[in-house]
Amino acid sequence: MAMKMKGIYKSFKSIMFVGKERDLEIGHPTEVKHVAHIGWGSSGSDPGWMSDFKAGAEFLSPRTSSFSHTRHSDSFFTTSDSTEFDQDQLNISDRIRDVPPIPVGLSKIHTKSKNRRKKPSSTSSPRSRPSPKSSRSMGLSKSSHKSMVSRLNSNA
């Protein structure tokens, strides 16, 4: 009985979706009205409400050769808002400059430490346990440990 109900449900489900697909088919007339040729061109046929946006578009246009800090008097940007925006941009660039570079070999160090098997440590020998601050416990190889020690010694 459950199989018959499942089959009936599937047939109703397919009938429901067939009816909806007809609305999405290409070629049927729609109620959408398209408006063409309203843009940022130099023609005088732009509507009156576009004048504010046109001034802003001239300011933001990628066609300008250089970005200057001069503001149009009829622009919809206010002077205080644009000044704050410029200051925010400077602060972001300063922040990016202050970030230290990521060491090149850092990702290699971490992948090696994940793949390395740990040897069982014996409790009888105190040498087998690395100290918590040792370079070996940080996942550094012998060669990177030697180069780090030599750099520290040369800086001191």
From Swiss-Prot:
The gene is RIC11. The lineage of its organism: Eukaryota, Viridiplantae, Streptophyta, Embryophyta, Tracheophyta. This is CRIB domain-containing protein RIC11. Disulfide bonds: none annotated. Residues 121-142 have a biased composition (Low complexity). It comes from Arabidopsis thaliana. PROSITE patterns: CRIB. Residues 109-120 have a biased composition (Basic residues). Residues 26-39 form the CRIB domain. Functions as a downstream effector of Rho-related GTP binding proteins of the 'Rho of Plants' (ROPs) family. Participates in the propagation of ROP GTPase signals in specific cellular responses.
